[in-house]
């Protein structure tokens, strides 16, 4: 069986709908079972309530991202890292808009999300491989676990999470997909459904094959109604830059999509 792992939807309803439709299409063909989300359901696009409602309607369990927990607890800032004063300003605008427009029931749903989830595909026996889900890292959901982190850093995080040889830990937050194995543990960044930053505008998620042992890790990209998302942002009071970022896949020079 394969698990579908999605992360960083960021209120992009058209992207989420397309990803869930793709997962549904693969259920029998690719033996896709449960779907889990790795947080940051809200922020940056105008559908926070609709995204959280759809996640709950579909019975998709998951964890809190930094955006979810800060909105739910009325913090002053989302805990996002900005690389310029302008980016910091945009971050504050998005966070303020989300807090102002989110419904009480949505806020409550975000508040109920746990920090971490541990899954055992074949029962609860500790000899089975474990899949651990966090948003940023086992220590902080605001920590950026990028692909250039050292093997020693990965080993430290695995030890902190209590992982053993054959286990897998999945996370998001950076919006850039990658995977590697260090000391027998698989490390997987799922990328982003609703706000990719790797130059590819398409929504991204991961399929993890899990049984007696962890098998393949497949990165999936899905085209969605980008113009609907762009139009939704432009019709809201959110900055037009967020629409431009969606078109460019989060980078000034988007990659060529095959």
Which residues are covered by each model-predicted region?
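Beta-strand-turn-beta hairpins that frame and shape the catalytic cleft
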Residues: 1-4, 119-132, 182-186, 215
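N-terminal active-site segment of His-dependent metallophosphoesterases
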Residues: 1-60
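Active-site neighborhood of phospho(di)ester-bond hydrolases with catalytic His/Asp-centered motifs
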Residues: 6-7, 35-40, 61-66, 134, ...
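Active-site environment of divalent metal-dependent phosphoester hydrolases
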Residues: 10-15, 43-46, 67-73, 168-181, ...
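Glycine-rich phosphate-binding loop signature in dinucleotide/nucleotide-binding domains
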Residues: 23-32, 121-128, 161-165, 207, ...
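Active-site neighborhood of divalent metal-dependent phosphoester bond hydrolases
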Residues: 51, 58-118, 128, 140, ...
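Anionic-ligand binding region
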Residues: 148-188
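Acidic, His/Gly-rich catalytic cores of divalent-metal-dependent hydrolytic chemistry
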Residues: 180-258
């Amino acid at each position: 069986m394969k698990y579908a792992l999605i992360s960083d939807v960021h209120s992009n309803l058209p992207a989420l709908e397309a990803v869930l439709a793709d997962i549904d299409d693969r259920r029998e063909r690719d033996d896709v079972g449960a779907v889990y989300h790795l947080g940051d359901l809200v922020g940056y696009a105008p559908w926070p309530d609709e995204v959280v409602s759809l996640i709950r309607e579909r019975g998709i369990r998951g964890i809190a991202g930094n955006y979810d927990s800060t909105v739910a607890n009325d913090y002053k800032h989302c805990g996002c890292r900005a690389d310029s004063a302008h980016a910091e300003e945009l971050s504050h605008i998005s966070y303020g808009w989300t807090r102002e427009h989110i419904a009480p029931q949505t806020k409550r749903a975000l508040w109920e999300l746990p920090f971490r989830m541990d899954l055992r595909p074949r029962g609860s026996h500790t000899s089975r491989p474990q899949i651990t889900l966090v948003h940023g890292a086992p220590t902080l959901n605001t920590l950026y676990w990028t692909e250039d982190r050292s093997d020693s850093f990965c080993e430290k995080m695995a030890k902190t999470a209590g992982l053993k040889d054959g286990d897998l830990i999945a996370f998001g937050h950076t919006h850039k997909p990658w995977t590697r194995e260090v000391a027998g543990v698989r490390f997987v960044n799922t990328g982003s459904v609703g706000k990719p930053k790797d130059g590819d505008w398409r929504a991204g998620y991961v399929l993890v094959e899990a049984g007696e042992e962890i098998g393949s890790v497949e990165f999936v990209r899905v085209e969605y109604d980008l113009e609907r998302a762009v139009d939704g942002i432009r019709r809201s009071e959110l900055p037009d830059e967020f629409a431009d970022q969606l078109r460019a896949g989060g980078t000034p020079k988007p990659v060529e999509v095959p």
